[in-house]
Amino acid sequence: MNDIKVMNHAADNIRILAASMVEKANSGHPGGAMGGSDFINVLFSEYLVYDPADPTWTGRDRFFLDPGHMSPMLYAGLALRGFFSMEDLKQFRQWGSVTPGHPELDLQRGIENSSGPLGQGHALAAGAAVAEKFLEARLGSTMMQHKIYAYISDGAVEEEISQGVGRIAGNLGLNNLIMFYDSNDIQLSTECGVVMNEDTEMKYKAWGWNVIKINGNDVAQIREALDAAQKEQDRPTLIIGKTVMGKGALRADGTSYEACINTHGAPLGGNAYVNTIKHLGGDPENAFVIFDDVKEIYAKRAEELKKIVAERKAAEAEWRKANPEKAAQMDEWFSGKAPKVDWSKVEQKAGSATRAASAACLGVLAEQVPNMICASADLSNSDKTDGFLKKTKSIVRGDFSGAFFQAGVAELTMADMCIGMMLHGGVVAAMGTFFVFSDYMKPAVRIAALMQVPVKFIWTHDAFRVGEDGPTHEPVEQEAQIRLMEKLKNHAGKDSVRVFRPADADETTVCWKLAMENVETPTALIFSRQGIAKLPEGTDYEQAAKGAYIVAGSDENPDVILVASGSEVSTLEAGCEALRADGIKVRVVSAPSEGLFRGQSKEYQESVLPKNAKIFGMTAGLPVTLQGLVGANGKVWGMESFGFSAPYKVLDEKLGYTGENVYKQVKAFLAEA
């Protein structure tokens, strides 16, 4: 172990760099970063196992930061490890820099997750811990023996998601999860005591955690806590570190600026900054430096890591020789490539609900994709993720040989944990719940989209046809909301989320195939509760890969084009016979993914939905859901209000989702044109 005086000097070095980054940017959060520097320094210089020459090594420990506003602490700590230059730190929060205001996923620089929205970061970490246990059950402890470290703040503990993470991690006994709670009792607007009065230690103990309380600015106590956490065999560990906001900060008049709300979210400023840097042993005129003795302890750690990693990789090489098939499988799992699936094994029943069709696909995936985890928020028998569950078993405490993750009623926690599983690597994760409850998951959808994590969202009971449960459970605006993510580009220029709403059972198979092949972005799959009539014989379902396509039986040179997704396609088909009896030529278009369709050539788009054509759309969501497809001269029949409680066939009649009303509305539309 390093001399404590040098360790304290290193922590002060991180504080100086963190405060200076914020000062130079004239923007950011110095206080928390200064308070947490001791833990970060101890973890990075003495405990975290990683390969400096191979940042993506699968056997590395992983560190997940939850409070992204403490990025100056992370960047400064990573700079001591050699991942960032002083120039990088000087460009904090500037255009084009590698040090954005909140950390963004960058494995080559040691950043395991994007963070910012409080609470999500430690949920990602808990998911990564599940993935490590899952893979250890399949590959053994030689290949999977690392720890998952998480760093949380008072704000994360206040966020509702901490309840889900605390419950699930404790229930599963994730002893590979070590979480540091930076408890400084200060937040942006108030002292924490104004808004929270609870015994956090007892709360986590009640969830089954090993809880250790320490002085979070004391090197010896941090070491002792980490030693105990690493030895824990049965429980996740929460280290509650009582830290000092703005540790070492001085005001302009030289008095203490510690434990003050003002240091949370603003630069120290002027003479307060100058006094603070001097007090910590730095030079305000040349603050962006790493002290020589600090360089030494991190150079020493780098040498230690060379030996540790060499031993680990030698053991891994021996394992590979002894287990060539498993080694090849592991490489495939961590490759980021789409898994190989024989989709011909999927057997669909005509007329089934698309949630049931999804279950058929999930059953095949459970058999053919051994590194896939499927989850549900206490709805597996309704969202039909039980199609997967029936071919495996649930993950439980002490036995991670199953592949089904029972999250309980915790949609946001489930989503973030599944994303964390994929961030860990080696795992494909999917999760299910009712579409209306996607509202609980939007923050996770967004962070997955931002990080380009190809997780699969399974949302069933897609419209008012939920029926008797009534408007609280009947999605209306949800499809329009999620399809907005098809229009939003990620930083790689791709649609940030791929969305599918298939029209029948066979189209469901194709949509699942496309979802599994999508390794660039999250995918949302939206399925019906009720049975849906099969599309006309001869429909080329593979055309669904283009996002929208012409359904078999459509007329040449149509007078009108009818377009929809999901179950409304069959409703449009039901109105075609009467329209054709009146001599009207009709084309029906199924559009499971507008985003994919807009990615096709202009020629293809024009061949399916010509600009000057008369286009009528039907959606069980808001009319705006289809507005982009029907165009300015088109017409959409959609929901103008929340749904109602009644049998779904009654609602079809009352709300106009029948073949008869399609005929009536299209005739009126053509008469207007």
Protein language model annotation of sequence segments:
Residues 277-308:
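Non-catalytic, alpha-helical, charged scaffold/linker segments
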Residues 155-161:
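Short acidic, Gly/Ser-rich segments with clustered Asp/Glu that frequently serve as metal-coordination loops
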Residues 149, 373, 561-563:
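Conserved beta-strand elements of the Class I
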Residues 152, 213-216, 409, 502-503, ...:
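Conserved residues at beta->alpha junctions
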Residues 150-151, 179, 375, 616:
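Residue-level marker for buried hydrophobic side chains located in beta-strands
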